[in-house]
Regions:
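A short beta-loop-alpha structural element at the N-terminal edge
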Residues: 3-16, 158-171
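Acetyl-CoA-dependent GNAT
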Residues: 10, 18, 22-74, 80, ...
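Conserved acetyl-CoA-binding loop-helix of GNAT-fold acetyltransferases
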Residues: 84, 90-103, 239, 245-258, ...
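Conserved active-site alpha-helix within GNAT-family acetyltransferase domains
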Residues: 95, 107, 118-137, 250, ...
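Conserved GNAT acetyl-CoA-binding A-motif
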Residues: 105-117, 260-272
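Surface-exposed beta-loop interaction hotspot
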Residues: 147-159
Length: 301
């Protein structure tokens, strides 16, 4: 019997965790709990589907809407987690779930699906190839989490503190000075994700004379894109151009690494657009290197 594709619900939680553990060899209860809670709070930002055969769950898809950080002006849908029961593979469940995901994305005006995979995950790569994904132009960089060298200059380090809900207006203003665009909706979503959806709150703000002048938005998840270890994702980092080259970006990244090391997070990962040369140079100077993971994209026509 063919699998039926339907919305994923909270009642599917135990079945999803059990199926994912059979596929990956480890239970990710906290990850799926966070994702289902996030979808309940913001249903327009999340697309979560289940495949069921004779009432039993045989597959799942977890995806979320991105706000343009992946190079698509209309936004993209990020395919975060995907699984099909090994006993039900090659029966079309994965293909039907992906087709339904694409339909829902088009209905919301989304222009692309994006995801990541390790270059040695041959089963996933084969599925993405069959689904007509292509290599994305973005580079994935990563940094093993270990404490950075201490700055031995006499100047006091910039003040860096945890992100707070009330920082949004300042972050939008700083980002507009950097990009020339009003990305208020994007940053509002990122602040909400950082404060409520991340397994641990690690986003930071840098201050000068009591006023925010820079920020680093990141999440710690125990499951995105098939990560089984603790991996942090750096979504965006920015410093007010009027305070550029004053050490704020380095202070933000250094404090983040210190915090992640204390939490036993293994690595920090980010995606960078090919034309973001200044950001790439900063990250490479800070120790980031090319990841063994690859970015993929599928245009929705």
């Amino acid at each position: 019997m063919d699998a039926t594709v339907r919305p994923l619900t909270a009642a599917d939680f135990d079945a999803v965790v059990a199926l994912d553990a059979r596929i990956g060899g480890a239970a990710r209860c906290g990850y799926f709990e966070k994702r289902l809670q996030a979808a309940a709070r913001h249903p327009r930002r999340h697309l979560q589907l289940a495949a069921a055969t004779n009432g039993a769950l045989t597959g799942f898809v977890l995806a979320r809407k991105a706000g343009g950080e992946y190079g698509d002006p209309e936004g993209a849908v990020v395919l975060e987690a995907f699984g099909v029961d090994p006993a039900a593979r090659h029966q079309g469940a994965g293909r039907r779930m992906l087709a339904r995901l694409e339909e829902l994305a088009r209905e919301r005006g989304i222009s692309a699906l994006v995801t990541q995979a390790h270059w040695r995950e041959h089963g996933i790569l084969s599925f993405l190839d069959a689904a007509h994904f292509e290599l994305a132009p973005r580079r994935i960089l990563e940094l093993p989490v270990q404490r950075l060298p201490v700055d031995d200059t006499d100047a006091p380090p910039p003040l860096v503190r945890n992100l707070r809900e009330g920082d949004l207006e300042s972050l939008v203003r700083i980002d507009e000075r950097i990009t020339g665009q009003d990305r208020g909706d994007f940053l509002k979503a990122k602040v909400d994700e950082a404060l409520h959806d991340s397994a641990i709150q690690v986003s930071l703000v840098a201050e000068d004379d009591g006023f925010p002048v820079g920020f680093a938005m990141a999440r710690v998840d125990f499951g995105d894109f098939g990560h089984l270890g603790a991996c942090a994702s750096l979504d965006t980092i920015g410093v007010d151009p009027r305070f550029a080259r004053h050490g704020f970006a380095g202070a933000l990244l250094g404090q983040m690494i210190e915090n992640l090391a204390a939490l036993h997070v293994e690595r920090l990962e980010t995606e960078v657009a090919p034309d973001a040369l200044e950001l790439q140079r900063f990250l490479q100077r800070s120790g980031f290197t090319p990841s063994q993971r690859v970015a993929f994209r599928k245009a929705l026509r």
